[in-house]
């Protein structure tokens, strides 16, 4: 049987090879003898048709109504939706990281919150967020948008929002930005884990991603007042160190202040660590986030332009890795042992730090930015623990503090070309990120305070002790007999 199969395979290969063999022989026979030298083509000569041109001409001559155009716009649009899918995967990373760094009795609750966030995030962004985020001409501070309409209307290369030319359709831009919108609430989810009331969090998350995030984002990405910063050069926040990460981080800080620490975390004898139940899950979550970040930053190029895209991928990877190395070194010195959770947060700190400036810094600059972010995150986590701000996953430090660092780093490490002038300065960058942080903090504090005095924001001590899987959902994540 094996012999028969091989014989058939050889016969089939021979049949396939015959046309190529005769084609090559014919081409060789038809080719003229080598000439001493051919005359140079005139400067204005038409370029020879390539295989793609031949294919398009063949399709056109066949009477077909549609022929794919392999052009820059098409490739850019394809890259945008791929990047959106990569950012979507980040939400699985956030959920897995949060589950791993918390107690097993709260796993179902955390997964439910993250599932709700992505669902309400995309829907609310479609109903109000997108056209609030990109309102076009407005007064620079506040403009509430309507639900999305036909985003293909007048679509094409060069069509966009707020005067921004995009190499994508309106729908492509919407789905990419919608993935960003849900991220802010996901950051808060990790910080308030294990003791927040589910209904209160759901109301808060809806208002945050549907209203607050797009309003603040419009100040920068929607043609708002931040365009006047840095001497008219605008606020530099390439992919969202401020308007996504610092926004989420300082929103989380406000919520944690009102919510309080988990029971037993801080005692008269000092700080009692509440260990996460699965470091493998936490590690998987971080590497999913690392992967998705290539879409987060790479998609923010808003096209498939090879130069910027390659630079952004490189600076993103370098900053993440030096962030991890910085966290490893510092945590080993300070804690006397290599700490995996600090290392994982070091990766994320480097990624947050480079998100503002990935397109304007050098490879060396990216490594320094990531290294400093990794050092910052260790001291920041320890600082918040010391002042009894209980953040189970380190979200405030990773996203809030390192988000601020990324914005300032854009001014410090900006590469200025020969003959060009510096565009971004510490004063303008600091003003922009403080405005974002203050807006996020005040909005979140007010909303969470209203929820606290009305429906309540914290579960009872009994429910917290039992675990929110059973208390809120009536079902544990793990059935261990």
For the regions a language model picked out, list residue spans one by one:
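Bacterial N-terminal signal peptides
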Residues: 11-20
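Hydrophobic alpha-helical transmembrane bundles of multi-pass membrane proteins
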Residues: 5-9, 23, 27-481
